[in-house]
């Protein structure tokens, strides 16, 4: 029999890896179902009580004043809040949720969304779109989950779920600042696949996941990516998370071309002050004539102070280094600082969140910079190394529950 080529051998190892994962999942599910059946036959359960469902929605709109006054009204290289000098609805969504609990083991999420922030966040600049991506982008977390009665409780989840990578959410209402940091826009906000989470004890929780790729709306190839997260909570005020994502993000799927991303988050929450530190590093060898090894790093240090029940203040310094331009599209180092003043107006199940925010971004590198009001050459918008933004945002939220 002829020897396998390097590429074929790599694919064989990849698929053998995922076959083993699939067999393990089937065995786990079989064990779970058998355990449930035995428990039901030996210990008949009382009539279950009504389950709690959560529903709501939000509307997020803002005006970002860019003092560079770019002719195209764009925040260069960004996937969220990328339109400036105009009023925009950046996100609007409605949702329905039910948590998986011991009394009602099946859970679900359904989220419908629209707005500027749903246009490009899950796509890739270097890979084709997933079939159906134009309507899939209107789905936020949309999944089913099951809490299996194994040990302390194994939670299985499948569908579109919130990413295990990163400190910041796609939805500004869930963040301390209105605009997201650079590292958030170049890592997944959502994932499409399956995951299994298990609490080993009150301090350690482990999660394994298999997803369709780095970006959930991209179709770089037919090989899934996989990863894990370990979460450690030594006290009620401190959390440490380490997450690894590994898989191919280009047409060439040999193992040497797989992308590796490591994300580390340390958060400390006190009564009024929350401090977090995030560092991620990614690397990937690009299949091209020279096969360059690309590298990028990101770090942020947000500090949030709840001045009162309604007022809060946040400052967030950050730095993003894209040595080869693999993620941002340009070889550059970006240093930024964001300062946010927030005021909340609660009313029954609704609330209004008002934010006034300033951010300054400085990009250095042969191809770095931000759009301005000049022209570098006919048909090409000029670039400035520094950008100042002043944002005013209004986020209206509604959240309630019913029992069924």
State where each predicted segment sits.
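N-terminal periplasmic/intermembrane-space "pro-region" immediately following the signal or transit peptide
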Residues: 2-4, 18, 24-79, 393, ...
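Outer membrane beta-barrel
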Residues: 44-71, 76-213, 222-224, 231-235, ...
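Gram-negative outer-membrane beta-barrel proteins
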Residues: 63-71, 116-122, 164-168, 214-218, ...
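Hydrophobic, lipid-facing positions within transmembrane beta-strands of outer-membrane proteins
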Residues: 89-94, 137-144, 190-194, 224-228, ...
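Detector for outer-membrane/organellar transmembrane beta-barrel domains
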Residues: 202-205, 223, 228-337, 343
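Outer-membrane beta-barrel "beta-signal"
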Residues: 341, 345, 384-404
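C-terminal beta-signal and adjacent terminal beta-strands/loops
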Residues: 347-383, 404
